[in-house]
Design a protein with these regions (language model features):
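Transmembrane helices with small-residue packing motifs
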Residues: 15-16, 23-57, 61, 119-126, ...
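Extracytoplasmic/periplasmic membrane-proximal domains and adjacent transmembrane bundles
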Residues: 9, 18, 51, 122, ...
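Solvent-exposed, membrane-proximal periplasmic/extracellular interface segments of envelope transport
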Residues: 4-6, 61-137, 195-216, 237, ...
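Flexible hinge/switch segments at interdomain interfaces of large molecular machines
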Residues: 37-48, 85-90, 128-150, 179-185, ...
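Signature of alpha-helical transmembrane segments and their immediate interfacial
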Residues: 1-37, 433, 505-558, 603, ...
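Helix-loop junctions and hydrophobic alpha-helical segments within the transmembrane domains
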Residues: 323, 330, 334, 409, ...
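Hydrophobic transmembrane alpha-helices and their membrane-interface caps
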Residues: 28-33, 346-413, 471, 879-963, ...
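Transmembrane alpha-helices and their membrane-interface boundaries in multi-pass membrane transporters
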Residues: 398-412, 434-453, 460-507, 628, ...
């Protein structure tokens, strides 16, 4: 039965091919214009955050009675990788991290199960534990942030304006969530006059209870009539500050007005909530998150349009400034990559024209937009957005997708020159090349299989690379057997070669150069075949040398971003108040204002910035924490400011832990160098961590070396004498309540204003809340209403305790982190430090560990996830080779050419000083498919020549000479197509590794593979 010929079918139905070309181009343009646009691809955060509080508890009590119980329960969650907990004072935060190989569709059910487990365990926790607050939407990105500021307006007035804008902006399509930053909680302070309280013989607890009862919402019941249910509503809840002041208090058979013994004032919570400043001015931030699947650029334009309308309603004196504009960044990024895509197309076309001639080159050129357009359609239908990875993948694929078209049109040209007709030439090209091309295309695709099958956050971040390459390469094969023959039939001339008598001077020069080159190449082949042992030993030696050189190449997981932001994170001593942190921020504000390198800057006091880019890791709220997001005018300004700012902050704030860094590409890590120490005993863990820190102190490349478990903080322990307290009619509860009311205030009720719930805070008169020396003389109310100094019923001792306790998998864990000098790569330095700790690690007690943390740990995990599916890749490649070559010996020869790429990879990375990271490793793995593809072409041709009756040695030399041009041409097209990617910080490691490896491997394949063939079959 005659084999079905796709090219023959296409030539008989040219109108259908032209029609679908037009349709695909049209829908491709539509898809490109309507695809979602993002800066970075999405990846699923496999982390849930659980917050709990137990007011009054010490960190150790909180850890023992609350954190450990919840953490132990959550360790039983199916799919959990590890838990990590942070106990700060009487608050605790637990991070639940799922395994990276857990499928994305299993994550949401896992979080539901975690919620159920927390609810089950909650019953066993001590009374008074508050919470839990659960955040399983840890990856929300607030790409657009605005700041509302105005010196003439109060925080509350700014908040009201921000709330109004928020309500209006929620109507914009694709708005997912809007959060306000820096909102200061209003509180209605009820400040009690202690003397009047004593004269009425009313206790603090009695008054507090009376206020609470008055502000409680209590159901009044329902009357059921024959026709209706009528609900009863009893008025009396606080609806304005005056109502609180006029509230009647009935205690000890007397009715009093609260205002007679207290001052009622509206103020802000003290200590304050986390604060937000825009260029040194107090502000309210409006952070806007976009729905998944939205077009970031269009979303930004819609927000801008809405705000342009709303700005007219903003009162004079209030300023609305943009802090973060991710849509603008995305637009620039997509524009840059689109330009790189067109540059790559132009480069590939030039290669085609230069090597194939004008008409033949035009056929290849017209095939490219068909493939690219169809790829856009499939991307659009499969929900793959335009971002740095998907567009970079298209650029990468460009150099590969023209290979099949080049092979087809070149074969057509050869047959036309031999006098064949267009139809016969095109159909013969399909018969002779279609299935070897398909095998080669599938093998090239198989090189990207490890990434497609890999699990984990990093693989998810880069997965669209493999999918887009698969699409483009498979489509390129169909285009080469359907579109290229039709276009070649129309465009390529049926012209026999000119007789030598008609040659021009240029023709003679080109002919002579070609003859000379191929003559020298044949001589080289003859020499190599005659010295096969020497050639194989040299090749093996070069490969071994490359393997040994790999550890010498600097390593970097992912490079820093090229965005203009600098992130400055500062952690002051653990016991620092938020007021102290705010005062330090004012000093920094003055230093930054007017700086020539800065466009804008914002500060977050007591909190970190919202996640305005996916690769930014949010910070916990802490009174001693300060973060700046500084946007510079250019990359050059960013680097200059970084070099100026880091030493200034370290010198000006010696007690603070300063971390100045750029935004990252890829999954985030807080510090470039991170190690962790874990073990069962907290004291021993600290001792080991101090040894590690001391060792790191001697490394000149490191600075700002510190723990995430800070030094102890002062605590005043008040020991109540129960006998003395009992004689005075009080107990420890009454003393604690009195001190809380005196120093910090006690929540005694709520006051409702619109959608605001304002706490009513009960305070006892003027106090010495900021004066530790006055603690012993603080007045404590007795049972009869009189006052005695605290020292009369208690002894006060000052001690030190851990302000923070970190656990990982319920074990005390300390993370030691450091910054690095300019030019030093964090990953490489982390592994270097880890190796230098060998003596400490060898002497660790049983149960204690020192492990990689941060980016270094993530890189090891990511590479393991990438390498794990490689056996599947190998199986697929071997299977395709067996079907194509049909002999085990030939299959192994083709496989053995793949490692040759490593020689070129090591050379290229060393020459360009490019670090070896995740993308470079990905390039090395993907490179193997391309090298094996070239081997198939050569081995297949040798077998064809032998089948035609050529002697084995003659077949080897003729095949290498004949296939030299197409193999080199496709390799050069792939290499030159990578040039636009070499300018990208993210893509350059892959592009350089791939190009260097392919260049060297292609040259070696044309020499070493014939030698391997001759050696195996003993051909002389």
């Amino acid at each position: 039965m005659k084999q079905f010929n796709l090219a023959e079918w296409a030539l008989k139905h040219k109108s259908i091919i032209y029609y679908f070309m037009a349709v695909l181009l049209t829908f491709g343009i539509f898809s490109y214009n309507h695809m979602g646009r993002m800066e970075d691809p999405d990846f699923t955060m496999r982390t849930m955050v659980v917050g709990v509080a137990w007011p009054g508890a010490s960190p150790q009590e909180m850890s023992d009675q609350v954190t450990d119980k919840l953490e132990e329960k959550l360790r039983d969650l199916p799919g959990v990788d590890y838990t990590k907990s942070f106990t700060d004072g009487s608050k605790s935060v637990i991070y639940i991290n799922l395994k990276e190989n857990l499928p994305s569709d299993k994550i949401r059910p896992a979080w539901e199960e975690a919620r159920n487990m927390i609810n089950d365990e909650w019953k066993s926790l001590p009374q008074g534990v508050q919470g839990p607050t659960i955040n399983d939407r840890f990856d929300d990105v607030y790409g657009i942030i605005y700041a509302i500021s105005g010196d003439e307006y109060s925080y509350e007035e700014k908040r009201q304006q921000a709330e109004d804008l928020k309500r209006q902006l929620l109507s914009v399509p694709n708005v997912k969530k809007i959060s306000l930053i820096g909102v200061q909680q209003q509180t209605l302070n009820v400040t009690i006059n202690k003397d009047k309280l004593a004269s009425y013989k009313i206790s603090t607890q009695q008054l507090l209870t009376a206020i609470k009862q008055q502000s409680m919402m209590v159901p009044a019941g329902m009357i059921t009539t024959d026709t209706n249910n009528v609900y009863l509503r009893v008025n009396g809840l606080f609806d304005n500050p005056q109502a609180v002041q006029d509230m009647p208090i009935r205690i000890n058979n007397q009715t009093l007005r609260l205002g007679d013994m207290a001052d009622v004032t509206m103020t802000y919570q003290d200590p304050s909530d986390p604060q937000f400043y825009y260029e040194g001015k107090p502000a309210i931030g409006i952070a806007i998150s976009m729905d998944a699947g939205g077009n970031n650029v269009e979303f930004g334009e819609a927000i801008d349009k809405k705000l342009a309308e709303l700005k007219k309603t903003i009162p004079a004196g209030l300023e609305l400034d943009q802090v973060s504009n991710q849509p603008h960044i995305v637009k620039e990024s997509i524009g840059d990559f689109s330009q790189s895509l067109f540059e790559a197309i132009a480069i590939v076309l030039l290669v085609s024209f230069a090597s194939l001639g004008l008409r033949t080159g035009v056929v290849v050129a017209l095939t490219i937009p068909v493939v690219v357009s169809t790829t856009f359609i499939l991307m659009y239908e499969n929900g793959i957005y335009l971002h740095k990875v998907s567009l970079g993948a298209l650029i990468l694929a460009l150099g590969l997708l023209v290979d099949d078209a080049i092979i087809v049109v070149e074969m057509m040209s050869v047959k036309l020159e031999e006098g064949w007709g267009h139809f016969r030439s095109a159909t013969f090209a399909y018969q002779s090349t279609a299935f070897p091309m398909l095998s080669g295309t599938l093998i090239t695709c198989a090189g990207f299989l490890p990434l497609a099958l890999a699990q984990g956050m990093v693989a998810e971040f880069t997965k669209s690379l493999s999918i887009v390459v698969f699409m483009a390469l498979i489509l390129s094969w169909f285009a080469s057997v359907l579109v290229s023959p039709v276009l070649g039939y129309k465009i390529i001339e049926n012209k026999a070669p000119k007789p030598e008598s008609e040659w021009t001077k240029r023709d003679r020069i080109m002919h002579n150069l070609s003859v000379t080159f191929y003559d020298k190449f044949e001589r080289l082949l003859h020499w190599a075949l005659g010295h096969h042992k020497v050639v194989l030993l040299i090749t093996l030696g070069a490969f071994v040398l490359s393997l040994l050189s790999l550890p010498l190449i600097k390593q970097e997981f992912f490079p820093s971003s090229t965005r203009n932001e600098i992130i400055v994170s500062m952690q002051f001593p653990q016991s620092s108040s938020i007021e102290y942190t705010a005062n330090q921020a004012k000093i920094i504000d003055e230093h930054l204002q007017g700086n020539e390198h800065i466009s804008t800057f914002t500060s977050y006091i007591g909190q970190g910035s919202p996640r305005f880019v996916l690769t930014l890791e949010p910070e916990l709220q802490r009174n001693n924490f300060l973060q700046y997001v500084i946007v510079t005018k250019s990359l050059e300004d960013r680097d200059k400011l970084y070099n100026e700012l880091t030493p200034y902050l370290n010198e000006e704030f010696p007690s603070a832990l300063v971390n100045t860094q750029f935004l990252q590409i890829g999954p985030p890590s807080k510090y470039p160098v991170m190690l962790r120490v874990s073990g069962p005993d907290q004291k021993v863990v600290k001792e080991i961590a101090n040894k590690v820190k001391d060792k790191m102190q001697g490394d000149k490349d490191l600075h700002n070396i510190a723990f995430d478990w800070p030094d102890t903080e002062p605590v005043a322990n008040i020991h109540i004498d129960p006998n003395k307290a009992r004689l005075l009619g009080i107990d420890s509860y009454a003393v604690s309540l009195h001190l809380q009311s005196l120093l910090s205030g006690t929540k005694s009720g709520e006051y409702y204003e619109g959608n605001q719930t304002i706490p009513v805070t009960f305070r006892l008169g003027d106090n010495e809340q900021h004066n530790l020396s006055a603690l012993s003389s603080l007045p404590i109310q007795t049972g009869n209403g009189s006052y005695v100094p605290l020292s009369q019923i208690a002894t006060i001792t000052m001690t030190q305790e851990d302000g923070i306790i970190w656990h990982r998998n319920m074990m005390p864990t300390i993370s030691i982190h450091a910054n690095v000098k300019a030019g030093v790569l964090g990953n490489a330095k982390t592994k270097e430090v880890y190796k230098s700790l060998q003596d400490i690690r060898d002497s660790l007690p049983t149960g204690y560990t020192i492990e990689l943390d941060g980016a270094a740990e993530k890189s090891v995990t990511a590479v393991q996830n990438l390498v794990t599916p490689m056996p599947i890749m190998l199986f697929v490649i071997m299977t395709i080779l067996m079907f194509q070559l049909k002999r085990i010996a030939l299959m192994f020869m083709a496989l053995l050419t793949a490692p040759l790429g490593l020689i070129g990879v090591v050379l290229a990375l060393n020459i360009t000083r490019t670090p070896l990271g995740f993308m470079a490793i990905l390039g090395i793995i993907a490179l193997s498919g391309m090298i094996i593809r070239n081997s198939i072409i050569l081995l297949d041709q040798i077998e064809i020549h032998k089948a035609e009756g050529q002697k084995p040695l003659e077949a080897i030399i003729n095949s290498a000479t004949l296939r030299f041009r197409p193999i080199m041409l496709t390799a050069i097209a792939a290499i030159l197509g990578m040039i636009p990617l070499m300018g990208s910080v993210f893509w350059s490691p892959l592009a350089i590794a791939f190009s260097g490896g392919l260049l060297v491997a292609t040259v070696l394949t044309l020499i070493v593979l014939p030698v391997m063939y001759a050696t195996w079959y003993k051909i002389k």
